[in-house]
């Protein structure tokens, strides 16, 4: 869709391009508001923590752009782009988006639920690295890279189904034992009037608006940047890198603005898990012979991913009932370090 938008805006007058940007922003904001409202309504109706709603339904929707981009890249013989999209999104979601969310507003932490999902996040990142290793030629991994076999990609998709199933089971258990968090307090503030199916459809509509709006916004902003003669390197480092993570960003900002920061936390952690199991998994499973892993991933991008996730893990462990401002600043600093390393260290581009 982005290519169609790019072809459409390239011949438009700058005023019309700015109008397209304004319209896309309006669609994104409306979609994010609808997404957050209906996610909270489902949380209250089902007695499920908002963090789990964010980690499952919402993150499944917001990671669709990454999945589409990575699968198409793998099909075109661009493994670096396919895997780089997934790993780059994990770094941006965790460092930039969650860091900004915790700076802008309050991100509550329900320790039992967050720790459970966070360790799955850590485990999935580690699993991605292990699955990429060429165990018969480990000495040359930094030169020749590795490969995620096709059957491993299929296994990732099976683990995705298991993750969603276990999340549903955990939510039911937490609800039954009263460990689902402050749901009762939410019921005093929010009174869902629609049937859960209607709320779910509205939530999906909100996700669609956010995703479609993002697909329109990025090419329009990129065209404006070109006309303003902004260097391509700056465009690549900002607009292109942020493009597929924009749904998570606007969802996080809308969530904390409305006082539902745990939804933002759940969306980011869930998106990280799905970027491994869904995005990388689908890319490898649909690529004959498996997904090649260029050597620069072992030299830079995998360590960067683990570094940012470790900062979040320490931030959660050192926080009580919310992700504190020091942890938020640490996440942003970690993100800046990883981006700077990508430009300063002598590694090949994705």
Which residues does each predicted region cover?
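Hydrophobic alpha-helical segments, chiefly the membrane-spanning helices
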Residues: 1-350
């Amino acid at each position: 869709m982005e290519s169609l938008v790019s072809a459409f805006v390239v011949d438009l007058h700058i005023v019309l391009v700015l109008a397209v940007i304004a319209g896309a922003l309006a669609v994104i904001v409306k979609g994010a508001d609808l997404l957050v409202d209906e996610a909270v309504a489902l949380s209250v109706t089902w007695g499920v923590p908002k963090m789990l709603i964010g980690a499952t339904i919402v993150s499944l929707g917001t990671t669709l752009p990454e999945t589409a981009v990575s699968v198409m890249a793998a099909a075109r013989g661009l493994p670096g782009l396919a895997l780089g999209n997934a790993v780059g999104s994990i770094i941006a979601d965790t460092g930039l988006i969650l860091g900004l969310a915790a700076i802008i507003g309050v991100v509550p932490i329900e320790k039992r639920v967050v720790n459970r999902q966070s360790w799955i996040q850590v485990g999935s990142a580690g699993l991605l690295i292990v699955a990429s290793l060429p165990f018969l030629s480990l000495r040359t991994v930094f030169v020749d890279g590795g490969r995620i076999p096709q059957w491993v990609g299929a296994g990732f998709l099976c683990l995705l189904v298991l993750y969603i199933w276990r999340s549903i089971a955990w939510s039911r258990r937490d609800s039954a034992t009263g460990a689902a968090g402050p749901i009762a307090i939410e019921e005093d503030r929010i009174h869902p009037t629609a049937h859960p199916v209607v709320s779910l459809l509205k939530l999906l509509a909100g996700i669609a608006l956010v995703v479609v709006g993002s697909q329109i916004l990025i090419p329009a902003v990129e065209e404006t940047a070109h006309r303003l003669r902004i260097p391509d390197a700056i465009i690549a480092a900002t607009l292109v890198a942020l493009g597929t993570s924009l749904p998570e960003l606007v969802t996080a900002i809308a969530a904390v603005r409305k006082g539902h920061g745990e939804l933002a936390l759940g969306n980011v952690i869930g998106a990280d898990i799905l970027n491994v199991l869904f995005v990388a998994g689908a890319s490898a499973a649909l690529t004959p012979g498996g997904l090649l892993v260029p050597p620069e991933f072992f030299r830079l991008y995998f360590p960067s991913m683990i570094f940012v996730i470790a900062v979040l893990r320490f931030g959660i462990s050192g926080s009580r009932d919310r992700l504190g401002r020091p942890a938020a600043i640490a996440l942003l600093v970690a993100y800046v370090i990883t981006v700077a390393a990508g430009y300063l260290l002598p590694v090949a581009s994705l």
